[in-house]
Amino acid sequence: MRDPRDIIKRPVITERSMEMMAEKKYTFDVDVKSNKTEVKDAIEAIFGVNVDKVNIMNYKPKAKRVGRHAGFTSRRRKAIVKLTADSKEIEIFQGV
């Protein structure tokens, strides 16, 4: 099994993700090869919370240009994690 800190890359801090925190839903960028079960186990191992549900979204790379040089941004995978009602909050989002 992979290390949980290799699966969870970073939290996503946006207006929408901050509003979803009231419903105990937290948003993270995750590894593009990870699945829902790995994300659930990683969140429970890192933060010590109980996960109810995991939704995952894939983002395709976008075409970008700098002068005459063309390329693509890297593809992303985002996970929205819903905690159980009796679970504690995730502390990483408290200071934001």
Curated annotation (Swiss-Prot):
Q: Which Gene3D superfamilies match?
A: 3.30.70.330
Q: Name one GO biological process term.
A: translation
Q: Name one GO cellular component term.
A: ribonucleoprotein complex
**Keyword Protease included in the entry's annotation:** no
Which HAMAP family does this one have?
Ribosomal_uL23_B
Tell me the subunit arrangement.
Part of the 50S ribosomal subunit. Contacts protein L29, and trigger factor when it is bound to the ribosome.
Q: What does this protein do?
A: One of the early assembly proteins it binds 23S rRNA. One of the proteins that surrounds the polypeptide exit tunnel on the outside of the ribosome. Forms the main docking site for trigger factor binding to the ribosome.
This chain belongs to the protein called Large ribosomal subunit protein uL23
Instruction: State the species of origin.
Output: Bacillus mycoides (strain KBAB4) (Bacillus weihenstephanensis)
What lineage does UniProt assign to this protein's organism? Bacteria, Bacillati, Bacillota, Bacilli, Bacillales
